[in-house]
Amino acid sequence: PVTSITLGDIDKALALEGESQFTTKCAACHKMDKRKIGPPMAGIMSRRSPEWIMNMILNPDEMVKENAQAKALLAEYLSPMANQSLTEPEARQILEYFRQYDNTNN
């Protein structure tokens, strides 16, 4: 599991890659600004830690077994998050996209 992430200034190139990853791997179930099959992602950086987000992207099955917040999301949305088999660098790109989105839209 990801235990520590150091965040600096927003990396726009990394965020652009993350937007592409999100569109390809996540947008079937998630929208940024409203509920779909899964929860909206807007504001995620203020609701969850970067480590939590990375672990949920990388290993949603384990998170739903072990993490109370992930269990609560499953109970609310009734559909487990699919494991997209993303690498840690790909998950980091998505995290950066979330950071940029929240920074721009808040």
Where are the language model's segments positioned?
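C-terminal capping alpha-helices of c-type cytochrome domains
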Residues: 51-56, 79-106
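Short pre-active-site segment immediately N-terminal to redox-active cysteine/selenocysteine motifs
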Residues: 14, 22-25, 33, 37, ...
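Sequence context of c-type cytochrome heme-c attachment sites
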Residues: 2-5, 31, 71-73, 80
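Residues at helix-coil transition
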Residues: 23, 31, 58-59, 96-100
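Gly/Gly-Pro-rich "capping" loops immediately C-terminal to redox-active cysteine motifs
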Residues: 15, 19, 31-62
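Short, cysteine/histidine-rich loop/knuckle motifs that typically chelate Zn2+
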Residues: 28
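Axial heme c-ligation environment in periplasmic c-type cytochrome domains
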Residues: 37-44, 61-91
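Electrostatic cytochrome c docking/interface patches
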Residues: 1-21
